[in-house]
């Protein structure tokens, strides 16, 4: 089961229709914290860590069918149809979940279309894998190492949210994401 961060009422008349949020590539449920809390005034909002991201389980299978099955597993535990918001990679997974019959009432897809793209994110994975984690003692050192490959400080800051400095490891299954890059930038046959 995916790791979930839940906000708002869980049951009762205040609960309303639950909203599940599926983040994009290299993200996590924590990225949606402020928005999720704001939306949780009258409904339960669940921000997921998608597989191979954050605190969720890692798997070699990072296909959109597998990601959609993960979303459906969470949705079915709520015992009612859900609203689903998917961003980028999470948006593609959300589309596949909706088309596969998951109990989804409304679907919101942000910043992605159901098509294949040609721009690979492999250079970002390569940059992250180049960081000498066994020599990193703080986020500033990791940022310095990443800056040799990624010029944009905002992108580096976003990526570094997935670095656990104390364990000297990424909270991302970079080998699986790398091996699945063609699937990630593509869109499956439904």
Placement of each model-derived feature along the sequence:
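Active-site loop/oxyanion-hole signature of alpha/beta-hydrolase fold enzymes
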Residues: 5-11, 33-40, 46-85, 89
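Flexible "cap/lid" loop of the alpha/beta hydrolase fold
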Residues: 95-99, 103-137
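Helix-loop "lid/cap" segments that line or gate small-molecule binding pockets
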Residues: 127-134, 141-154, 162
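Conserved serine/cysteine hydrolase catalytic core
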Residues: 167-190
């Amino acid at each position: 089961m995916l790791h979930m961060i839940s906000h708002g009422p869980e049951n009762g008349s205040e609960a309303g229709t639950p909203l599940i949020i599926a983040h994009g590539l290299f993200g996590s449920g924590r990225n949606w914290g402020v928005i999720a809390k704001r939306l949780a005034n009258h409904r339960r909002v669940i921000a997921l860590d998608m597989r191979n991201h954050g605190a969720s389980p890692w798997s070699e299978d990072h296909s959109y069918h597998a990601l959609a099955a993960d979303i459906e597993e969470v949705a079915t535990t709520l015992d009612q149809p859900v609203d689903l918001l998917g961003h980028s990679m999470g948006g593609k997974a959300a589309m596949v979940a909706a088309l596969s019959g998951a109990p989804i009432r409304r679907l919101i897809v942000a910043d992605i279309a159901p098509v294949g793209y040609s721009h690979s994110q492999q250079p970002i994975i390569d940059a992250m894998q180049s960081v000498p984690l066994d020599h990193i003692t703080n986020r500033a050192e990791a940022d310095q190492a990443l800056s040799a490959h990624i010029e944009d400080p905002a992108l580096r800051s976003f990526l570094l949210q997935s670095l656990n400095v104390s364990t000297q490891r990424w909270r991302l299954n970079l080998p699986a994401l790398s091996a699945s890059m063609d699937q990630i930038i593509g869109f499956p046959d439904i």
